[in-house]
Structures are given as structure tokens and as C-alpha cells.
């Protein structure tokens, strides 16, 4: 049996609707490309679903592991303190075990997007688009 992975795409949240739209679109793109991955979204504040609601949205999906991925470019107080506290993980141990449908599920907390060639390529692409 292959492990079924869940990805919880985490956003900050905003009063402006396009913030939620972007997080939702990124989650949809992940789900379309990686078919055996269940993708849900959750927000730190100002938007629904909350992170807790996002985790609960995995109920009934059969995932055995969830990876919470902050869709933030770099570390800050939210990624180092607020989100880990909500998820029940620490800086030293970025994983925990949660219960979903009476089963143990491992929850991992990933690094933010960070410095990566894909981010650099996207920044260059946006620069070229600005000149069109």
C-alpha cells in the first residue's frame, strides 16, 4: 500500500479576497500535478478555513501524512512562532502526531519557499512581464 500524502497550503490571510484566491490556485495546481496527493488550504487569520479547519478537511481522505507548507517567501515571526504554535510543533521538532478519524497521522511543518532557482526564475519572469 502506498502512503497517501496530504499537503496543507498555508496562507497568512487577508481582508482582500485575492490573497485567498492565490493560495487556493496554488493548492489546485499542486493537486492537478501530483494526483495521489490530497491538498487543502488553511489560513493563519482573517480568512477561512483556519489552519485547524484545513487539517480537519483531510478527514475521510485516507492520508497517513500531512505536510503543512507555508506559502511565505521567507521566515518571520509567523513562520517561526505563530504557525508552529497553531500546528503544535516546535522549532526543534517540526513534526507531531495528530488524530484523524481515530488514526494516527504524522503532521510535518516545512520550511517557507525560500531562496530557490524556481523563485528566481519566477522573479525574472515577472520582471520581463512588467516590460511588456
Task: Locate predicted features.
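Active-site-proximal alpha-helix that buttresses catalytic centers in soluble enzyme cores
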Residues: 1-132
Amino acid at each position: 500500500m502506498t502512503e497517501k500524502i496530504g499537503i496543507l497550503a498555508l496562507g497568512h490571510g487577508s481582508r482582500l479576497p485575492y490573497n485567498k484566491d492565490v493560495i487556493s490556485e496554488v493548492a489546485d495546481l499542486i493537486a492537478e500535478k501530483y494526483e495521489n496527493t490530497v491538498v487543502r488550504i488553511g489560513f493563519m487569520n482573517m480568512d477561512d478555513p483556519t489552519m485547524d479547519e484545513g487539517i480537519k478537511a483531510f478527514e475521510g481522505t485516507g492520508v497517513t501524512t500531512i505536510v503543512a507548507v507555508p506559502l511565505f517567501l521567507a521566515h518571520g515571526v509567523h513562520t517561526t512562532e505563530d504557525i508552529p504554535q497553531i500546528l503544535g510543533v516546535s522549532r526543534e521538532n517540526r513534526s507531531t502526531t495528530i488524530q484523524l478519524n481515530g488514526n494516527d497521522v504524522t503532521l510535518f511543518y516545512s520550511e517557507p519557499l525560500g531562496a530557490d532557482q524556481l523563485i528566481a526564475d519566477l522573479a525574472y519572469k515577472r520582471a520581463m512581464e512588467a516590460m511588456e
